[in-house]
From Swiss-Prot:
Record key words, sorted: Cytoplasm, DNA-binding, Transcription, Transcription regulation
Pfam families per the UniProt record, alphabetical: TACO1_YebC_N (PF20772), Transcrip_reg (PF01709)
Keyword Transcription tagged: yes
Cellular location(s): Cytoplasm
Protein name (Swiss-Prot/TrEMBL): Probable transcriptional regulatory protein SYNAS_07390
């Protein structure tokens, strides 16, 4: 299982998503605001805003919150900080490649906090380009294997233009080119196939398998990174054997 899918699974098992819903809302609102500021408030011509609103709806964010964030971005209402996007790259325990996407109003503060988290958990922050070449931007649509017809999903996804379907222990991950993401998701959703999550993200080309000690370190590091208010997304190219995953998520 890929690092991103693995981390999503353990968060659901631990109930971390519900306990940190307020923090998730804050991150999504920042993304909606910036997307609207950069590309306007019309979702038809702004795919980034469309993805941000999809993420908000997946978290059951009230429509008023979404609309207010869009209006802040377009300047219809005032308020809000001016954020800058930065991607930090580095290595985690066991040489795992890590990408950290942040949205910050103070780069000096943020880079110091990110560097501290890397160092404290057996990693080190690197320079621009040190690991980004190990990832590709892809659409990812994840389904619970117990809730879908796997054969039908594979057939429909490939016919709609999906590039690949990755089978995990409990999930199926439909991978698309970013330009085909909306089409494939809409086709599958139109056929009644409900996904667990859908987003455009950085997918690792290869993964590094971790032992129990390194896996525990890695998961703690990602948890601390995601808990940082400025961090929007974390991607890593690790793999954890299912038996170790079960032990760590117990």
């Amino acid at each position: 299982m890929s690092g991103h899918s693995k981390w999503s699974t353990i968060k659901r098992k631990k109930g971390a998503i519900d306990s940190k819903r307020g923090k998730i809302f804050t991150k999504i609102i920042k993304e909606i605001t910036l997307a609207a500021r950069l590309g306007g408030g019309d979702t038809e011509g702004n795919s980034r805003l469309r993805q941000a609103i999809l993420a908000a709806k997946n978290e059951n964010m009230p429509r008023d919150n979404i609309d207010r964030a869009i209006k802040k971005g377009t300047g219809e209402i005032g308020g809000g900080e001016s954020y800058e996007e930065v991607t930090y790259e580095g290595y985690g325990p066991g040489g795992v490649a890590v990408l950290v996407e942040v949205m910050t109003d103070n780069k000096n503060r943020t880079v110091a906090e990110i560097r501290h988290i890397f160092s404290k958990h057996g990693g080190n922050l690197g320079g621009n380009g040190c690991v980004s070449w190990l990832f590709e931007k892809k659409g990812s649509i994840v389904f619970d294997r117990d809730l879908i017809d796997e054969d039908a999903l594979m057939e429909l996804a490939l016919e709609a233009g999906a590039e690949d379907i990755r089978e995990e222990e409990s999930q199926m991950d439909v991978i698309t080119d970013p330009s085909m993401f909306d089409k494939v998701r809409d086709v599958l959703e139109g056929k009644g196939m409900k996904y667990v999550q859908a987003s455009i993200e950085m997918v690792p080309q290869n993964t590094i398998r971790l032992d129990e000690g390194k896996a525990e370190q890695m998961l703690k590091m990602i948890e601390k990174l995601e808990d940082n208010d400025d961090v929007q997304n974390v991607y890593a190219n690790f793999d954890i054997p299912d038996e170790i995953m079960e032990k760590l998520s117990a």
